[in-house]
Amino acid sequence: MVGAGTETTSTTTEWAMALLLNHPEKPKKAQAEIDAAVGTSSLITPDDVPRLGYLQSIINETLRLYPAAPLLLPHQSSADCKVGGYDVPRGTILLVNAYAIHRDPAAWEDPAEFRPERFEDGKAEGRLLMPFGMGRRKCPGEALALRTVGLVLGALIQCFDWGRADGVEVDMAEGGGVTMARAVPLEAMCRPRAAMRHVLEEL
């Protein structure tokens, strides 16, 4: 479980950075939020993460577009039932395709577009997000994963200005596997923010 959590957390952080590099106005907005809520005299802490609404929206939108586990864990039907008009006998193994649900144009406006704002202020669209599953059988590590990604991504945004390594748009091709890694490694350029340099020098 620890290994699975580590891989999915790092994968989500990498996808988030790739998306932010292709949309440079988004990390600027997140930087402004962090500066206002946390300041520049200390690093972001785990207690800060839940208070940073736009950072949370970036993470949610990343998980919508690139869920670390695009197919949720298999479940078995405990009784005969109907799902979407289909007969499902008792004992059937069921998989939920979170990737397809998160990109369904019937459920999401402009589903292929990276738009963290869709999760702001409790908008209805946000209730359809399920990267960790739903109900009593959803991933028990959800809270830890969200807190960890928030802390890592928040610190990267707070402390550095980021740019694309070669100046061209980051390739968003998806790799294969159980977890949805990137097809090509992410390369980026970073520069310490002047406002955070004194904090970084003390680390």
What are these model-predicted stretches?
Residues 23-26, 69, 104, 135, ...:
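A structure-centric feature marking long, well-folded core domains of fungal metabolic enzymes
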Residues 66, 78-80, 96-123:
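Conserved cytochrome P450 K-helix/beta-meander segment immediately N-terminal to the heme-binding cysteine loop
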Residues 51-54, 128, 145:
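An acidic site on a long C-lobe helix of protein kinase domains
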Residues 35-37, 41, 134-203:
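Cytochrome P450 proximal C-terminal region
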